[in-house]
């Protein structure tokens, strides 16, 4: 979730099998059973459920009886059963989840002792429960985005896409958006010049089109430990978005590489900017420089708080603040062919209760009741109107706006660059262990 600075011949045999009404053997997906090196288990093939296309099969002349023909017809009309998504815990009954990608810290002269220090390793083991929460969330994230990447197609409504992703998070986490585990923040599905913070409200009719470039920003939390990771999807076959996608992905990896204990935030931003702005995008004979969106940042993450104080710039901004041991950061970059600066525009869908507002009194009885619903279901985690409606809330907009005006709830409207421009995003969550950093959300896809 974006941090905002103020100011992705067998046919004949098959035919005979059908005639005899013999079930075809089902091949097991090895990934479902054991996953891959990054914990990318593909146990979510339930979205590949299609009716068998028997009309195009080659068949030999048959002397089957009428009853045989009837059986064949019934067989033909059968649909494959959908696999039900089950909680991730069933795959890891001992509660030990796949680790992310480990990386050495930069500043070798300062941090080389961390790799071999037994004391640092001991300190790391003391926080094992925390790391396992992040790894569980990251494994859910990988499975959910695998399902999204294999299922999302042009022609789907944004509501359909959001429900696909969010229901998968709920099912894999085994929770329906509770404070124990589930959705970490509203699913971002921002298109084209919209850079971040768009998710559909109920009744939104927006449809994904073939030429759209869509940022998919998914949050998963376990016990308040939020995994924040995003990718960009395109469906255009002429490759026009390849350059901006490559620029942003490479800039994000540069930010991850440069991050570490005692590293200054300005230095990370400068490295990101150098990579991002070395790219150009061509469209219709015109060349557009790819710019960092300078008022969007990465950010550190605290328990139940997605933006926790420190911002990781994607340009050199002079911030001499250092990253510290034990912190968690979302390293994200945004590239644009527009102005490289975003402004709020459009109907708001994202909200979050502010921290430290216990002393603020809701202005009405209805807003007080609404605030209780927010506290019980989301705490300080971000949420959207659709999630509020799942709790049973109706006719809440006036009360919600009262909470916003009184500073109890913060609103995060969509943020956009100039119309007609294109924006892209990639993001990973990193954990600053005492001895190494872990890119916990890393997968085979990005």
From Swiss-Prot:
Subcellular location: Cytoplasm
Keywords: Aminopeptidase, Cytoplasm, Hydrolase, Metal-binding, Protease
Record flagged with keyword Transcription regulation: no
GO cellular component, one term: cytoplasm
Cofactor annotation comment: Binds 2 divalent metal cations per subunit. Has a high-affinity and a low affinity metal-binding site. The true nature of the physiological cofactor is under debate. The enzyme is active with cobalt, zinc, manganese or divalent iron ions. Most likely, methionine aminopeptidases function as mononuclear Fe(2+)-metalloproteases under physiological conditions, and the catalytically relevant metal-binding site has been assigned to the histidine-containing high-affinity site.
Bias-annotated ranges (Basic residues): 73-85
Catalytic activity, reaction form: Release of N-terminal amino acids, preferentially methionine, from peptides and arylamides
Pfam families: Peptidase_M24
Cofactor: Co(2+); Zn(2+); Mn(2+); Fe(2+)
Biased composition (Acidic residues): 42-58
EC number annotated for this UniProt entry: 3.4.11.18
Amino-acid positions noted as binding a divalent metal cation 1 in the UniProt annotation, renumbered to this chain: 217, 228, 427
GO molecular function per UniProt: aminopeptidase activity; initiator methionyl aminopeptidase activity; metal ion binding; metalloaminopeptidase activity; metalloexopeptidase activity
Ranges annotated as biased composition (Basic and acidic residues): 8-32
UniProt cross-references to InterPro entries, sorted A to Z: Creatinase/aminopeptidase-like (IPR036005), Met_Aminopeptidase_Type2 (IPR050247), Pept_M24 (IPR000994), Pept_M24_MAP (IPR001714), Pept_M24A_MAP2 (IPR002468), Pept_M24A_MAP2_BS (IPR018349), WH-like_DNA-bd_sf (IPR036388), WH_DNA-bd_sf (IPR036390)
List of residues binding a divalent metal cation 2: 228, 299, 332, 427
BP GO terms, sorted: protein maturation; proteolysis
Region (Disordered): 1-85
Binding positions (substrate): 197, 307
Family indicated by similarity: Belongs to the peptidase M24A family. Methionine aminopeptidase eukaryotic type 2 subfamily.
PANTHER family in the record: METHIONINE AMINOPEPTIDASE 2
Record HAMAP family: MetAP_2_euk
Function: Cotranslationally removes the N-terminal methionine from nascent proteins. The N-terminal methionine is often cleaved when the second residue in the primary sequence is small and uncharged (Met-Ala-, Cys, Gly, Pro, Ser, Thr, or Val).
Protein name: Methionine aminopeptidase 2
Species the sequence originates in: Candida albicans (strain SC5314 / ATCC MYA-2876) (Yeast)
